[in-house]
């Protein structure tokens, strides 16, 4: 949002936000625009990796650990003919790419990989990864949401004494 910083007005359980033009909209709409709008954080050329690093950006160890977890899920499910791996809030697909690379060949051959992300599919992403705006249904395998909750705008927050 260009112009002055947004201001917030508490309206009971809902918070409204004014943009620089003085237009009011819900917190959810404002957060969605700031993250995924035409000039939003996740649509900028540098992406999140230009501002911070998460476990997927640091090394392949995290993706290998998730691949081991997926293999355990596969075994627990009795090695189904099709095993799904769904990465929620996939960013630029780094985790799902790393998981596919770390899987044993027999598991990788049965794995359907999904990257769930609102931002556009990155160029050059592995063709085996299906890019979706919402999770597929049904899922037989692992739905992994490592980064997803970071990006869910909360319209109502409640605290207690603890």
What name fits each language-model region?
Residues 1-3:
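Short, positively charged low-complexity motifs
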Residues 144-162:
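A mobile, often basic/glycine-rich helix-loop segment
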């Amino acid at each position: 949002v260009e112009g002055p910083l947004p201001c917030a007005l508490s309206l009971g359980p809902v918070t409204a936000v004014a943009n620089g033009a003085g237009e009011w909209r819900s917190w959810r709409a404002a957060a969605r625009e700031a993250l995924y709008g035409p000039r939003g954080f996740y649509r900028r050329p540098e992406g999140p990796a230009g501002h911070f690093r998460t476990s997927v950006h640091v090394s392949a160890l995290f993706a290998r650990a998730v691949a081991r977890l997926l293999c355990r899920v596969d075994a627990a499910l009795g090695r189904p003919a099709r095993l799904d791996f769904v990465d929620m809030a996939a960013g630029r697909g780094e985790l799902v790419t790393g998981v596919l690379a770390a899987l044993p060949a027999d598991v990788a051959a049965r794995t359907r990989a999904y990257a769930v992300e609102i931002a556009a599919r990155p160029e050059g992403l592995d063709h085996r990864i299906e890019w979706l705006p919402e999770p597929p249904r049904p899922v037989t395998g692992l739905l992994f949401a490592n980064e997803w909750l970071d990006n869910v705008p909360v319209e109502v927050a409640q605290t207690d004494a603890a």
